[in-house]
Amino acid sequence: MDVLYSLSKTLKDARDKIVEGTLYSNVSDLIQQFNQMIVTMNGNEFQTGGIGNLPIRNWNFDFGLLGTTLLNLDANYVETARNTIDYFVDFVDNVCMDEMVRESQRNGIAPQSESLRKLSGIKFKRINFDNSSEYIENWNLQNRRQRTGFTFHKPNIFPYSASFTLNRSQPAHDNLMGTMWLNAGSEIQVAGFDYSCAINAPANTQQFEHIVQLRRVLTTATITLLPDAERFSFPRVINSADGATTWYFNPVILRPNNVEVEFLLNGQIINTYQARFGTIIARNFDTIRLSFQLMRPPNMTPAVAALFPNAQPFEHHATVGLTLRIESAVCESVLADASETMLANVTSVRQEYAIPVGPVFPPGMNWTDLITNYSPSREDNLQRVFTVASIRSMLIK
């Protein structure tokens, strides 16, 4: 894997810097490195593809070295270099695709394609070794079963979940009280509602709670907490739990009271925040517990009192909500996040070449399914294919 990264890094630098008019002295070190790559690869044969619709391709390396010059690089020099660069880039692209579409239930962190296994040989270590990529660094750690650490921005840690629970219900669905939520990606939105605006509740207050368990532990997380849930701030028609009917939800938004968010690890509270909004942090956690209250306003203008009458019908429904968004965090496991395209790269290649469903990944690389059942085998394979996707993205956009 590190050899594949070093190949890609050398080719990217060569493609960017070996251009007509450049002083040879400015790129002499790069050309020496480029020539070392050619010397190492010459005389070797590789085969890629042969799975799904990914075609079989044979690769043979027999290239001349780039020479020295005292002057600027001319058009002939650059054209010779470009022909070599283009062949190598095409090779790296096909090795990456061949690796991204393969999976294994055992030792999925190790190279799975014949071409990448061959590149792992000791003779190829002479290619400019470069371990500067976070993905390569963590791949090496995971390969040795040592602790890894990925930094993610808006990590897709929450499987998609959208539903509701009713704490008070009746067949007519005209005086409901309960909680509804939407968990997806890096965000939780939860709303508590009471059609009667807590008119008969103790102290005219309804208590709500929402607990979310993560599939992986996050550490050093920066989090935004807001006293609102905008996705539940407009009228909607909702299917009943049994699917027999529908009910109408017409929210009027109040500010939540006594808001508390707890971050837990293995059942132990690590961080707690009360009535604190904006940016907060959490050291390490695998569970988030949100609790908040809907309190009937003790004093209301006539216009507000008209919204919340003391008896039915309740045409407007008192609602309070919270939004919790994980902006950045560190995780030992690889995840999809907002700043990278690794999941899209892997999925698109597998779809384009009609790769059959294997023993590890779900059909279509469905992320909700994948993260919901994030087994060690999936973790190993996902880290490997994401590492390869990061290498491919250096050359192929």
UniProtKB/Swiss-Prot annotation:
Record localization: Virion
Protein's GO biological process: fusion of virus membrane with host plasma membrane
Keyword Zinc found: yes
InterPro entries, per database record: Capsid_hemagglutn, Rotavirus_A/C_VP6, Virus_capsid_a-hlx_vir
Residue numbers binding Zn(2+): 153
Keyword Nucleotide-binding part of the UniProt annotation: no
Function: Intermediate capsid protein that self assembles to form an icosahedral capsid with a T=13 symmetry, which consists of 230 trimers of VP6, with channels at each of its five-fold vertices. This capsid constitutes the middle concentric layer of the viral mature particle. The innermost VP2 capsid and the intermediate VP6 capsid remain intact following cell entry to protect the dsRNA from degradation and to prevent unfavorable antiviral responses in the host cell during all the replication cycle of the virus.
Family listed: Belongs to the rotavirus VP6 family.
Comment field (misc): The VP6 trimer contains a zinc ion located at the center of the molecule. The zinc ion is not essential for either trimerization or transcription activity of the DLP. Zinc-depleted VP6 has an increased sensitivity to proteases.
Name by which UniProt lists this protein: Intermediate capsid protein VP6
Organism taxonomic ancestry: Viruses, Riboviria, Orthornavirae, Duplornaviricota, Resentoviricetes
